[in-house]
Amino acid sequence: LLFAVYAFARYGFNWIALSTSLIASVPVGFAIAFFETQSQEFRRRHRRNSFWIYLVYRTFRVVVWFMMLFFFIMLLVIWLNVDTYETIFPHSLYDFFATRKLFEFLAIALAVSLFSNFLDELHRKLGRDAIYNLVLGKYHQVKQEERLFLFIDLNDSTDIAEEMGELEYSHFLQDYFYDISEPIARYFGRVYQYVGDEVVVTWPLQKGLRYAVAVRCYFAVQKQIRRYSAYYEKRYGRVPVFKAALHGGTVVVSEVGKYKSEIAYHGDVLNTTARMLGKCHELASDLLVSNWVIGQTTMPAYLKTDDMGVFQLKGKQQEI
């Protein structure tokens, strides 16, 4: 798109400009998209930098990749077939490099990259759905929705906090919450709240039930923590261990707050899920899934479910 806009602004619309932009931009765009989706380690290393330092660094990184790949593709076209190059790129490389066109193009690339990275980081920090819903006023009026909720709670958090001290424990939670966010997003979950050492993840009901996405998300989170277990052992002397509960149903959702508005969920579903989470220790289970959820989704063949029985949860009249 950037190549097409530049070509149109510089030379007006013509098929040569369009073909130039497509031939150069499509492989460059795919390559940069691949690099960015594989940049988990880059984000992880620089996550404690200030927002603007990280933003500028990431933008510079993308622009460097962009220009390197662009030049590589142009040189490759020349090497493969000079006649083809002269047809597709009517302006010589020397003309492009030796005039202000290069600086114009770099300025456009830098501005577009900075703006897109700013939006991406804003979405990542504040929540993509939350921003759209607040701006569009989707929940300005109270509504009911069918949703799934996954409560993930860190085990032995009180003992860990006393052992590490408040400051070190806060760093520990930062790393833990950061690392589990990637698999949550990969499985289409949205973090609703961080409550102490607990994270609440939610899905629209059908999206979470399809292919048992919500259940598989839990195991993806486990895998992510195992991936960084050596880091946690070296940095903190322990690896996070957690339990979780999954339940779903009808909840009330609305926009609350005047000066710090947010989307809030209310209803029996959240209370029940929290009570289920409290049963994990008693039942020696890392994950409890309600029979209501099990009955509406098809579990992967590699997962085995055990019926834990029927329980009267605290504060609940109906058994689950």
Predicted regions and their residues:
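Membrane-anchoring hydrophobic segments
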Residues: L1-S21
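Generic alpha-helical transmembrane segments
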Residues: A17-S39
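Hydrophobic transmembrane alpha-helices
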Residues: I32-Q40, F51-R100
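Regulatory cytosolic signal-relay segments
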Residues: V82-E145
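Catalytic NTP-binding/metal-coordinating core of nucleotidyl cyclase/transferase enzymes
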Residues: Q141-R216
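Catalytic core of nucleotidyl cyclases, primarily class III adenylyl/guanylyl cyclases
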Residues: Y187-V213, S229-D268
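Catalytic/regulatory signature loops of cyclic-dinucleotide turnover enzymes
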Residues: H247, D268-N291
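Cytosolic regulatory/linker segments at or just downstream of nucleotide-handling modules
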Residues: E282-I320
